[in-house]
């Protein structure tokens, strides 16, 4: 998914210097990493990529629900766009079938929502002359 997402971001014209990749040990750590990136950088959009595969315990539901809730809470609290591309699947086969499409979709969503943020920031007067290089 990451490779598909990165390829699509580049195809959409996102410059390498505007892409940061951070890895974390598991899906539950993704919201924290997103928050740290948000706090340390001026970002228009972010992508959360991961995969949770159902096992034999309730852990699947917990990890799926809590990682999604953490991302949704951050979107609401910080007014930042996050394309949530954390797959929740029954098995590895399902994941393999979905990775290319979902990685590409996540990049498309991130760019579309990032562009929306830039437009609305300009309309609301949040845009500074330093940010013109990002367009």
Regions found by a protein language model. Give the residues of each.
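Short, ordered loop/turn segments at secondary-structure junctions
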Residues: 24, 50-52, 86-90
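Structural motif
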Residues: 20, 44-46, 80-86
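C-terminal binding/interaction regions
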Residues: 60-61, 65-135
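Short, well-ordered amphipathic alpha-helical segments that serve as non-catalytic structural scaffolds
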Residues: 1-8, 30-36, 70-71, 106
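Glycine-rich phosphate-binding loop
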Residues: 29-70
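Glycine-rich phosphate/diphosphate-binding loop of Rossmann-like nucleotide-binding domains
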Residues: 1-25
